[in-house]
UniProtKB/Swiss-Prot annotation:
HAMAP family on file: SecA (MF_01382)
Gene name as annotated: secA2
Annotated ATP binding sites: 86, 104-108, 493
Keyword S-adenosyl-L-methionine attributed: no
InterPro entries recorded: Helicase_ATP-bd, Helicase_C-like, P-loop_NTPase, SecA, SecA2_Bac_anthr, SecA_CS, SecA_DEAD, SecA_motor_DEAD
Superkingdom, natural source: Bacteria
Membership in a protein family: Belongs to the SecA family.
Reactions catalysed: ATP + H2O + cellular proteinSide 1 = ADP + phosphate + cellular proteinSide 2
GO biological process, one term: protein import
Membrane topology: Peripheral membrane protein
Protein name: Protein translocase subunit SecA 2
């Protein structure tokens, strides 16, 4: 069997497969040995492995025997034996890479191997699934194997109590969805004591459907937000103004990146309407913020594609799955701008208190691996961003699905009529049909055409999400026609009814190319699972969104030379080159956007790491707070000197009165040496004059070292000022990000400017935090009983 692996995989992977082949042979040779062991003897292997690791052996040293142990345990507990290709998948994951395995090839069983080996290190292993149902299912299934071998297994779910979460994280292996692990990380970094934190340091994670998590959701930030009031009238006014703006004249919109900005004419119009001189003045920052969000709501978000309205509320739709993101809202006033656009009541605005992107969250794991059926097309990105390779694992059974050639029509109307004709033809044979669509809007369009053709169907989109499991279970029945958005793709199985195999299995129809070949492959993969028969075909048109967005001009040039039949079908083969090229351009554009956004997010990620490191230090009650605050006092004095002893001004022009007042406040004394242009010509002069005063004050501060109450007060107040400052800083960075795109017109690199100006904002935020702590300490020393 392993010889056939070499033929199935490309030359680039042959060396790796050779290595895996030898390791799998070694594992197989141990199978008969493991079969002779009693349950207790097999369980004792876990203890032996742990001792070996504690005494200097590595995971590499024990992996062969450990894999053999897990295989034997799975046979006894589940009645399932790992195939050779599943062992290869486990080895790929153990190395921190991606195992590409089609759905139905037993990825869940594969994950049992590396999770066991890495859990032996007693540092915790996280298994990430795409939803709570799968996390619970996999924990209960594979967890039985690991518990049989003496390991502990936990489940991390939303809405769990902190004590239960802590228990889940203390387990050797913890299952859950990625966003919940991310939110726990943010909550831990908002905790007011160490006891409230639930996570251990990150060690090793395996992500199921890794492409969905690390590619599709890469830009999605995890946000913990508080509420702040928002001006309902102002949002409605800006929405009303926006309706008078014209594309190109007043604003630009890049459909590829969904980036929008005001033109000079647009800026002038805003300034005239609101009777202001310069929109970019600091005093008009709020107006600019409301207007740019109104613009985004107006042009970048489409009803029944990006969101739906339910009970007078905006419900966001996940564009990757088609599911409603219940409880999620857009931040920084964009959600309110959408409400104003649709004439809905304005809700309170979310103010970000903590955030992190999926990308930067998972990059914190020292070792990361994953499984998916579709990752090879994104291998470059996985390698560049996460330093992971994609290894294609062959199927245990051959794939019988027939992927038919795409058909391309001149108009969308001709395409949908052809889809109806195809559905009618296949429906007569009683084969089940799944029609995949890009959005709610498109699924309802397809439904209208099927209604006109009197074809029965089930419609499955975000508006019918609660019926998803029931509807998808029926999709493999004889004569069943199912229209589905992307939501029907992952985490659900279409089981073929008895007799459907003989009819040819499930037929999948794609109604539009997705913006990634990977997502197209996911749709095709709904048919022909686990060796079932099946087929797929895409019906496209030159009016499809991807074609119009990325190749509109090319299409117009090409139209004159196209041969078209009476049904609107394009007969020229060169149209396929255009479509394939367009999809590659689209993929490249999205990759570039993710790369650009990662550059921007890396700036705030570095800042977050500094703040969270300090915060965890503050939470540590063994840390002496006096050792933390004394440098803050000295830094604050340096900043005060810099603020008052301004370069480019003569000492006679410096405001010594204000300087003395600020120094008195920080040093908690009225006895500041006389300061004037006569004795202060530089910061060094000031430092020398304040030497004795500062020494005396530091002695008073050091006296608090043995005062437990003072230590606790300083700890809590420092946390308060740090959290408050960080919340304000996140808002400032968001506003900087909003305006940074405009700098392109000034021939400046936006990413570099964001880094430079973001660093300046961060320095200001940090200085302000240190000054607040220093001032509080000065007041506390003076009158501690009143603070």
């Amino acid at each position: 069997m392993l010889n056939s692996v070499k033929k199935l995989l490309g030359d680039s992977q042959k060396r790796k497969i050779k290595n895996y082949e030898q390791i799998v042979n070694d594992i197989n040779q141990l199978e008969s040995v493991m079969e002779t062991l009693s349950d207790d003897e097999l369980r004792q292997k876990t203890v032996a492995f742990q001792h070996m690791l504690q005494n200097g052996k590595t995971v590499e040293d024990i992996k062969v025997e450990a894999f053999a142990v897990v295989r034997e345990a799975a046979k006894r507990v589940l009645g399932l034996r790992h195939y050779d290709v599943q062992l290869i998948g486990g080895l790929v994951l153990l190395e921190g890479n991606i195992a590409e395995m089609p759905t139905g090839e037993g990825k869940t069983l594969v994950s049992s191997l590396p999770t066991y080996v890495r859990a032996l290190e007693k540092k915790g292993v996280h298994v990430i699934t795409v939803n709570d149902y799968l996390a619970k299912r996999d924990k209960e299934l594979i967890g039985r194997v690991h518990e049989f071998l003496g390991l502990t297994v936990g489940l991390n779910m939303s809405q769990m109590e902190s004590i239960d979460k802590k228990r889940a994280y203390e387990a050797d292996i913890t299952y859950g969805i990625g966003t919940e692990f991310g939110f726990d990380y943010l909550r831990d970094n908002m905790a007011s004591s160490k006891a409230e934190q639930v996570q251990r340091p990150f060690h090793f994670a395996i992500i199921d459907e890794i492409d969905s998590v690390l590619i599709d959701e890469a830009k999605t930030p995890l946000i913990i937000a508080g509420k702040k009031s928002s001006s309902s009238d102002f949002h409605h006014l800006c929405a009303k103004v926006m309706k008078t703006f014209q594309d190109t004249l007043h604003y630009t919109y890049d459909a590829e990146t969904k980036a929008c900005n005001f033109t000079e004419d647009g800026i002038t119009k805003i300034e005239d309407l609101f009777d202001i001189d310069n929109l970019y003045d600091l005093e008009h920052q709020t107006l600019y913020h409301y207007m740019i969000q109104a613009l985004r709501a107006h042009v970048a978000f489409q009803l029944d594609v990006d969101y739906i309205i339910e009970d007078e509320k905006i419900m966001l739709v996940d564009i990757f799955t088609g599911r409603i993101m219940d409880g999620r809202s857009l931040s920084d006033g964009l959600h309110q701008a959408l409400e104003a656009k649709e004439g809905l009541p304005i809700t309170d605005e979310n103010q970000t208190q903590a955030s992190i992107t999926i990308q930067n969250f998972f990059r914190m794991y020292p070792a990361l691996s994953g499984m998916t059926g579709t990752a090879k097309t994104e291998e470059k990105e996985f390698n560049r961003v996460y330093n992971m390779e994609v290894i294609s694992i062959p199927t245990n059974r051959p794939i019988l699905r027939e992927d038919k050639k795409d058909v391309v029509y001149i108009t969308a109307d001709a395409k949908y009529k052809a889809v109806c004709a195809e559905v009618m033809n296949i429906h007569k044979k009683e084969r089940p049909i799944l029609i995949g669509t890009m959005s709610i809007l498109q699924s309802e369009t397809v439904a209208r055409y099927l209604d006109e053709a009197n074809l029965p169907y089930q419609l499955l989109n975000a508006k019918s999400a609660e019926q998803e499991a029931d509807l998808i279970a029926l999709a493999g029945k004889k004569g069943k026609i199912t229209i589905a958005t992307n939501m029907a793709g992952r985490g659900t199985d279409i089981l073929l009814e008895k007799g459907v195999h003989e009819l040819g299995g499930l037929h999948v129809i794609g109604t539009e190319r997705h913006e990634s070949r990977r997502v197209d492959n996911q749709l095709k993969g709904r048919a022909g699972r686990q060796g079932d028969p099946g087929s797929s075909q895409f019906f496209l048109s030159l009016e499809d969104e991807m074609i119009q967005r990325y190749a509109g001009e090319d299409v117009e040039k090409l139209k004159k030379s196209l041969k078209i039949d009476e049904n609107g079908l394009i007969l020229n083969n060169k149209i396929y080159d255009l479509i394939n090229r367009t999809q590659l351009i689209c993929e490249g554009s999205h990759f570039s956007m993710r790369e650009y956004n990662l550059k921007l997010d890396d700036v705030i990620n570095d800042q977050r790491n500094v703040v969270y490191k300090l915060r965890n230090n503050l939470l540590n009650e063994e840390v002496n707070m006096i050792e933390i605050v004394i440098p803050m006092i000295k830094n604050t004095l340096t900043v005060i000197a810099k603020d008052h002893l301004l370069e480019g001004m003569l000492p006679e022009e410096w405001d010594f009165t204000r300087l003395v007042e600020d120094l008195k406040a920080v040093l908690s004394t009225e006895e500041i040496p006389a300061l004037s242009a006569n004795n202060v010509h530089s910061a060094e002069d000031l430092q020398e004059l304040l030497k004795d005063t500062l020494t005396s004050y530091i002695e008073r501060v050091n006296a608090l070292e043995s005062d437990a109450d003072a230590q606790q007060v300083l700890r809590q107040i420092s946390l308060h000022f740090l959290d408050s400052g960080w919340t304000s800083h996140l808002s400032a960075m968001q506003h900087l990000k909003e305006g940074i795109g405009l700098r392109q017109y000034q021939q400046e690199d936006p990413a570099r400017l964001y880094q430079k100006e973001g660093f300046e904002i961060f320095l200001h935020t940090f200085s302000h935090f240190e000054k607040e702590v220093a001032l509080y300490l000065a007041r506390y020393i003076t009158v501690p009983q009143n603070i």
